[in-house]
């Protein structure tokens, strides 16, 4: 392998032959303009290829969620619920939601580093539906979120998580979480385009995500909190996402919370999707 | 005049305080190579980006085959391709993957996109590198895959932004051959470059731009005549013969002679009227005269006008009227 690589690096490439070039240049019929769905899926395929070529980037959707789950279960389990296994039944849906929402910020970072590269100039000179490059990104990220969800679920099951909602409830809960994360990620695509360096994207993401995930119903029951904090927790979208996911996993579907999450997702998508595309077109 | 592929008038782009492009007019006839020549920071890339719909002009307007680059951007995008100064391909993907990606995005179905990718890789001599990530390509190979991606959908207008900057001479020649083949096919090419000989080799008309303005425009012949035929560089064995050599060169070449900081070197700038052949004749005559006068010459060379010299000549000329007016 390495020997062929060395050999290939020697620049002994044949010069392009004019007649071959002429042949590829003979006017082919230009195909019809591709649909928005088709170009989005193509950009999603690009994201998958990047994962295939650099599989190390899956570290944040495998090791990080495992660490979160183990850490908080054993740290708080005994104190809050008497035993880690007991606590896990309460914590797992929440830790899953918080881990996925945490890793959505990598979307902003990769948009920020990728957009500066010349290839985006090419994408932006193609006659295609403008948001498809961004949508494709997020489609690739959905795979990452799915991997993280499955990893957390796997670790949870090994540690003794027994969801009452069964396979259907858990699958539906993960789907809802992915749908919300898709919408939520547009916040980071916006910051990815808005801010100048990946460090600042990281900084802003942390500043938003830490309060959102910790000041919620993920780790403890909000009833134990002071009133002013409860007020914040109640309006925090993460609280509603976790409540919905928890209800679905336990088999006791809370229609109100699920609707809330879907509407909130739609609103976030409408606002930040629009802002992202504005910045993208102006960049 | 034949149909215009690119037509820009009064194009302006301002970044903060900097007027990167400060009122550029261009008229590029269809089916030709048009060279935009200028140093780094002259505004070449900014101008190209506006023409390729990547940047919105702050003033003026531009049309590609009659379509406005702002109001009809989508129609323009279906006609143009851009090969940027920095690789406009995805370095993490392989050569094949890049071309299939662009093929899919331009509306080819998967099998057609694959077939087109293979065909292009073969034509560009990249079949062996097809499965490697572009980041492992050499500079010349990157350029080729980049141009291959640009012509995948046979554009009407191709923008090449400094296509050979940083390439070795052989790769540079190959890129030139590719550009010639593309134009022969009927695509209009707008090429930016820092090298006069590149514009000379490829372009039929050239615009020289500096600080966001077109400072000269014309056919190669016109431009060269205005700049001068080149320079004769002479190095003597003995420094004390230099003033004698200077006088002799001024007399035989009727040229402006510059004494270099090196005490044995001097350069004569040939005037613009002489053709290239005339320049060589003049130079060999001068060499003979130097020998006859007993001046020992170590090295002697005839240089094409460099971009620096073009600039010097052009900016001097634009500066003169102001001075005489003052």
Please give the residue ranges for each predicted region.
Chain A
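Hydrophobic alpha-helical transmembrane segments of multi-pass membrane transport proteins
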Residues: 67-72, 88-159, 180, 184, ...
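Alpha-helical transmembrane segments and their short interhelical loops
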Residues: 130-205, 252-279
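Short helix-capping/hinge motifs at transmembrane helix termini and TM-loop junctions
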Residues: 72-81, 159-164, 168, 195-197, ...
